[in-house]
A protein has these predicted regions:
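Phosphoinositide-binding peripheral membrane targeting modules
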Residues: 30-40, 44-88, 94
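Anionic N-terminal interaction surfaces
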Residues: 1-42, 94-96, 112, 123
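Canonical phosphoinositide-binding patch of PH/PH-like domains
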Residues: 92-111
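Intrinsically disordered, low-complexity acidic/polar segments
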Residues: 38, 57, 102, 111-113
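Terminal and domain-flanking low-complexity segments
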Residues: 107-123
């Protein structure tokens, strides 16, 4: 996929994900994340890739989660139920072993990421 076909925030993050793709794998989006520990969330046609910066000694991990291992994707909000469903900029991706919470720079990015992950889970 050409860069103009991929939604992304930072070119260096897109390049980092592209360097780790499997043969034939396509990137749909790479969103910069805010908050402690998370660098970005990438969504491909085969998996979700999380960059985790929370390791001791300034080490960084890239974690791949195949869609078949994701048990749920959630919208996380501090508000009571009501109003716009996607007025939050945080989603959570759960597996049988952990839940990964990702805060984005805007509710529109959270909405897009949530819908892409959910679409792949339901295929």
């Amino acid at each position: 996929m050409a860069d103009q076909d991929v939604v992304y925030d930072q070119k260096d993050q897109l390049d980092q994900v592209r360097d780790g793709l499997l043969d034939g794998e396509k990137i749909y989006a790479v969103y910069d994340a805010v908050g402690t520990g998370t660098g970005f969330l990438a969504i491909t046609d085969r998996r979700v890739v999380l960059q985790d910066r929370s390791f001791v000694g300034k080490r960084v991990a890239l974690t791949s989660i195949p869609y078949g291992r994701i048990t749920s994707v959630s919208v996380v909000s501090d508000k009571a139920w009501g109003g716009s469903f996607f007025s939050t900029s945080t989603i959570a991706i759960a597996t049988s072993h952990a839940t990964h919470e990702i805060a984005f720079r805007g509710a529109d990015k959270a909405h897009h990421a949530h819908n892409l992950v959910l679409w792949h889970m339901l295929r």
